[in-house]
């Protein structure tokens, strides 16, 4: 057991992408830079753990505020009882944010606790969840916010250069022709395509039948 001594937010910003790239134009109104939000948990034994919350990319001050809301309910409690601390966070946030912003923050704090516990026990974090039968995990490239074929080819070329064999693209039902083209184009690079139907951007939500029809 090691009690939680302090919880704080760390916000970091850096240059990101090209100002004319479709992803920057569509998703980053402040231009080609990106912010990430981290939670730092300090245990009474002096060990610090870190976890990232994706909310920090888009609403860093909101992320910081939710961390500050939750921190007093966790400080002084056992940082090794991660499930109990997760339930504490749910009791604080579930009523007003069962999904969305608070979930990003809850996740970041939970990751930080896992990091701190694994460092204290001097073992890889995955061993806290049981052992592993694999010594490596295949990575994939995440992209596909492309308005032109040239942008898609640019991303495929980069993945090929890096030796990455899987490429996740984003799509909505109206993108069917673009998706069909990239599936065919990716074969030239021996790259497999995964399709993210962007459910978080769909209003109204895309139902399962629509997704199945899209795949067919």
PLM feature spans:
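Structured beta-strand/loop patches that form or line metal/cofactor-binding pockets in enzymes
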Residues: 1-45, 54
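Metal- or metallocofactor-binding catalytic centers and their adjacent structured scaffolds
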Residues: 42-120
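Conserved active-site and cofactor/substrate-binding residues in soluble primary-metabolism enzymes
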Residues: 33-34, 61, 65, 80, ...
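Glycine-rich, aromatic-flanked loop segments that form ligand/cofactor-binding clefts
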Residues: 106, 110-146
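Metal-dependent enolase-superfamily TIM-barrel catalytic cores that perform enediolate-based chemistry
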Residues: 130-216
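Short glycine/serine/threonine/alanine-rich loop segments
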Residues: 76, 123, 191
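Residues at beta-strand starts and edge strands
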Residues: 35-37, 68, 137
């Amino acid at each position: 057991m090691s009690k939680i001594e302090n919880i704080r937010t760390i916000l970091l910003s850096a240059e990101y992408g090209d100002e004319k790239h479709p992803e920057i134009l569509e998703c980053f109104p402040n231009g080609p830079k990106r912010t990430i939000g981290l939670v730092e948990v300090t245990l009474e034994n002096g060990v610090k753990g870190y976890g990232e919350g994706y909310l920090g990319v888009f609403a860093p001050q909101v992320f910081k505020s939710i961390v500050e809301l939750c921190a007093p309910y966790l400080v002084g409690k056992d940082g090794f009882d991660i499930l109990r601390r997760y339930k504490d966070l749910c009791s604080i946030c579930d009523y007003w944010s069962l999904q969305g912003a608070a979930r990003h923050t809850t996740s970041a704090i939970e990751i930080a606790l896992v990091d701190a516990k694994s460092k204290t026990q001097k073992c890889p974090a995955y061993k806290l969840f049981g052992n592993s039968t694999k010594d490596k995990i295949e990575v994939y490239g995440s992209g596909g916010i492309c308005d032109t074929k040239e942008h898609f080819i640019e991303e495929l070329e980069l993945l090929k250069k890096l030796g990455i064999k899987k490429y996740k693209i984003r799509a909505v039902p109206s993108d069917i022709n673009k998706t069909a083209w990239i599936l065919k184009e990716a074969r030239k690079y021996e790259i497999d395509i995964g399709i993210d139907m962007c459910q978080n951007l769909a209003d109204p939500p895309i139902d399962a039948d629509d997704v199945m029809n899209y795949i067919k």
